[in-house]
Amino acid sequence: MSLSRRRFIQASGLALCAGGLPLQARASGAQAVLPVPPLLESRRGQPLFLSLERTHWAFMGGRKVGTWGVNGVYLGPTVRVHSGDDVKLIYSNRLSESVAMEVAGLLVPGPLAGGPARQMSPGVDWSPVLPIRQAAATLWYHADTPRHMAPQVYSGLAGLWLVEDQYSKNAPLPNHYGVDDFPLILQDKRLDNFGVPEYDPPSSGGFLGDTLLVNGVQDPYVEVSRGWVRLRLLNASNARRYLLQLSDGRPFFVIASDQGLLPAPLQADTLPLAPGERREVLIDMSKGEEISITAGEAAGIMDRLRGLFEPSSMLVSTRVLTLRPTGLLPLMTDTLPARLAADPLPEGDVVNNRSIMLGSASSPGINGALWDPGRIDVQARQGTWERWTVRADTPQSFYIQGAQFLVKSVNNAPPLVEDRGWKDSVWVDGEVSLLVYFPQPSSEHFPFLFYSGTLELADRGSVGQMVVQPAQ
């Protein structure tokens, strides 16, 4: 059959375009090994140092490019602290612009919570002493600089922060960091042909990249022992929500959410992960079969070709991580504990009901008002409970600093099973009802913040301020 001139040109053009695809869109070579961030553990009497600085990192192809990071690496070390300790933390800003930092999910008084009120100019340090008085949980630290949070987090100012307590130390769960207990920080970026991250914030809504990174690399693998493997998942993307699943269809065993362990392990076939959310899961590798975690549907060839001429929001590859079991099955394999949390989830009497309306992609703000550092939007009382009804026409994540909450309903239906524990971040697509508890006080000079987890919307004003009066 003859080939017409037009069809020949079309076919030739597709072949040429495919040959000129960005490196991340072509078939890759050997998979990268999962980088495990170094562990920075608190020791009594010794401060923790977090230096915010320029560094270099190879996002693809082994070629290092300039970026930001903490303590010399893209993203930062995993900090591990222990409940009951008082931890001296020293942030050092070695960058050329001002930065504010926050440990999202850390329950400390307002003056110690970081954020805009603790902004550091270039060359300046901030040294809070943090009383760690909460249950074991996977938290994260990140830039929280007014109107610059999105580009600074995107550039690499983020990392995991683990709280351990006596119960978590003794629980029959994998806890050997980097061996059977792995941090996974998910981000989406746009990389040019040389592997340099590009950031061009959209005029409305949040930034969506086309390249999925895990701990700073694409499509990594990790070798694990045959047995239970624990994954601590963090969505550190600016706006993208992920829907995770396992390649062979088996369920995740979910053991923890933002603010700590669930009452008992739960099974979930798919696992949503909104910006700022953390979840901990267990995967049974005892059968000795390789398995992958995926995050939705990847872009097809035509979508990749369009990406040559215009920014794409579809991920080139959606494979998060491949787990490769090695060695023999241990002589003894632990079964899942029937109970996880040391204490049942309490509930108290609601003293106030609030309605929170999050701004849209084109019209940011909260309850119709843009962030004003001189205005207090919410007055609450330490040790009390409130019901917050949060609404959004534009789907987005929502975070409350200095508080913890239980999700009571989502669009008038029961919440997902994996959302039954203590949380500080939640996906809002319509309406969610939250039972909010305030364990720590704040003040007008050092208020807590609540804001959109779509970081570009937060930078444009989708932020509110809250004073929690000390308990009487």
Swiss-Prot record:
Residues spanning the membrane: none
Alphabetized Pfam families for the sequence: Cu-oxidase_2, Cu-oxidase_3
Post-translational modifications reported in the UniProt record: Predicted to be exported by the Tat system. The position of the signal peptide cleavage has not been experimentally proven.
GO molecular function: copper ion binding; oxidoreductase activity
Domain of life of the organism encoding this protein: Bacteria
Location relative to the cell: Periplasm
Signal peptide: 1-32
GO BP terms: FtsZ-dependent cytokinesis
GO cellular component, one term: outer membrane-bounded periplasmic space
Keywords, alphabetical: Cell cycle, Cell division, Periplasm, Signal
SUPFAM superfamilies: Cupredoxins (SSF49503)
Family the UniProt entry places it in: Belongs to the FtsP family.
Stated role: Cell division protein that is required for growth during stress conditions. May be involved in protecting or stabilizing the divisomal assembly under conditions of stress.
Protein name as catalogued: Cell division protein FtsP
Protein species of origin: Edwardsiella tarda (strain FL6-60)
